[in-house]
Amino acid sequence: GKTSIVYHIANAHSQLHGQDGIAIISFNDNRLGAWPQLQLLSASAGIDCFKIKNTTGLSELVANLSNRKLIIIDTPSNQIEENIGAIRTAASHAACHLVFPADVSAGTIKRFLAVERAHWQSLALTKLDDCLNPWAVIQMLAENDIPLSFAGARSALENKAEVAAIINALVGRGIRLLAPTPLTQTAWAGATLARTFAGAAVR
């Protein structure tokens, strides 16, 4: 899920910035088990993690960590407007990234895209193998200038071929769920759609 994506992003950047150059902050997250999981993953990567519950504490912690090259702030999916506001107060130039399961609903996507202060920089997808309905996220990638940056436990997606492969897999899965189409036709249709908007999904 999202906490695992945070770990993979931090781990992917540790070679560039070093473990001591990265910090992870869990902000205003009361999900059961989320903090212990983040602590465990951070410890396995040798990266410091912190837990903060309010805007004042977040601002103070970000200021204290100003020497770090990368600070990752993990927030829950509820109270998104308030959380983004707190992040903008603590770190006005922070880049905000979406993390969705591959079968996220259109309603959830709409709710997050409506948060104008976020200025979403990219999308990371989770639960690719368990996806039952990828069409909402496919439509989102086609209609919005938000690049796909991470997919599951993969390293960062850095070129169009990698993005197209992920989109092709999602489209193929969606087509198979809609109708019992022959495999060759499914693969062809998915590849065609992937080529159509893979360029819009990566910068």
Question: Can you describe what each PLM-predicted range is?
Answer:
Residues 141-203:
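NTP-binding/hydrolysis catalytic cores, primarily Walker-type P-loop NTPases
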Residues 22-33, 40-86, 90:
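Switch II (G3) loop of P-loop NTPases
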Residues 10-15:
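Walker A/P-loop NTP-binding motif
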Residues 32-35, 52-59, 81-84, 106-110, ...:
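Amphipathic alpha-helical transducer elements in NTP-driven molecular machines
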Residues 5, 9, 37:
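Hydrophobic positions on the alpha1 helix immediately C-terminal to the Walker A/P-loop
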Residues 21-23, 93-100, 116-159:
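Conserved beta-strand/loop subsegment of P-loop NTPase cores
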Residues 1-2:
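Conserved glycine(s) of the Walker
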Residues 76-80, 92-110, 130-131:
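Conserved Switch II/interswitch segment of TRAFAC-class P-loop GTPases
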